[in-house]
Amino acid sequence: MASRMRPRGARLAAAAAVVGLGVIGAQSATGATQDEPVSTPVPISTPEGQISSYVINTKIVSPGQVRKVERAVQSAGGVVVQSWPQIGVVVAHSTKADFRTTVVAEARNAVESVGPTRSVAVSEGTPAGAQAPWGPGKGQLKKALTKKGDVSEGTAATSTDPREGEQWDMQMINVPQAHQITTGSPDVTVGVLDSGIDPDHPDLVNQIDRAKSVGCTDAGRPATGESAWAPTTSDHGTHVAGTIGAERNGVGIVGIAPGAKMASVKVVNDDGFIYPEYAVCGFMEAGLKGMDVTNNSYYVDPFEFWCGDQPEQAPAMEAVRRAVTWSTEQGTVHAAAAGNSAYDLSDKTTNASSPNDAETPVARTINSSCKDIPTELDGVVTVSSVDRQGKLSSFSNRGLGSIDVAAPGSSILSTIVNGNGWGLKSGTSMASPHVAGVLTLMKSAHPTWGPEKMIRELRAQATDTPCSTTTRGAACVGTPEENSYFGDGLVDAYAAVR
């Protein structure tokens, strides 16, 4: 979203039309503008004998082209892990160092692009359902790394008394007024693409649509059992889910859309990584299972910014873009966190955090072709964070023409796994589910509206917010109607349902 945000709705519709025609390559990621420097290459090594993961994008979207690529994968000494014929994307594993060049040669003109999805070996190995020619390799276990993320500020609460009065965030965006009209429809489902939703939490146990829930962290293959989508090492998704849809049941808190349903779509592995194949699976499952809204409080690893002018990064970014566009075409609208680096998304120059699954990230030059995905993809609502005073949270990314709307994200009380309790977290990850919840109320009140209409109305209804000051990052520029900190303004739940 390096360009202005006003025409994004039109571009969303155009992208959906292109997918429908099966000419996805026309919308592929592009390079930097002529007056920008080329981004710094980050070579990714795929040595002989290491299980490496790849995405392969077909030139034309058709089952025949996908089958051609699948045969090429096998001929090149690889294994097909998952195919998505709807978007012309194949996920493959291989232990061959020359896999990329060989698969392109074997597929001839069927391949638009092929690239790695990680800078390290596949830690989970190849799924049992995929017949790997080299046997059941374990892959290489990697060291869990800390990336710029959200901050937990509290521990589990043991009290079962209602805590709605502590939810200043709901008051700020007029949720109580909205609830006088609707608390959400059980026919509307929100996909929480995250680390999983606690299925036993008293505020969430009745809110999860188990039939639509899915896990995507087994190399990008969907799995539907509870063990695949329940949280294991992180309560991030549980906290996000509480903001969206915690039940009004006399205990704990109340979510924005307690009358709707949520699907747990697990895209975060036990090391805390969200690789491209996981995200592709999550978006595709959202579209296939008829989810109306998704929340995406993450960026796709291992790059904080994926650069379209780099041949090793562009293919994975393209695969995620195709999945987002296709699911949007199915009627799913997506909200995403802007990020927690206090970065100006409209003025990209350098980055030193990627690849974050390696021991040593690379300091690199970046440009406008480099995108934080999924939040900077067309058709995704990009959400910045505000604090209790209505100012931009110091950690929040910003950028004129890059932010759509703002929502509360500092010291947000919501559900956590520890003790099936409640705790505080801060981050744009906490802001985005407020917008996902509002979109859920909007869909409940206006069931015939599609993604383009919903995004347009969400932005038009947002409360104009003048520039504020913050202790970190670029200063605010723009007008109260649209600026680099708040986009079109603070999201308004009441306006969304009227």
Specify the residue positions occupied by each region the protein language model found.
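Secretory targeting and sorting signals
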Residues: 1-32
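C-terminal subdomain of the subtilisin-like protease fold in secreted/lumenal serine endopeptidases
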Residues: 32-36, 40-47, 81, 120, ...
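Active-site alpha-helical elements of protease catalytic centers
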Residues: 186-189, 193, 222-266, 275, ...
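Extracellular S/T/G-rich loop segment that most often corresponds to the catalytic His/Ser-adjacent loop
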Residues: 357-444, 448, 456, 490-498
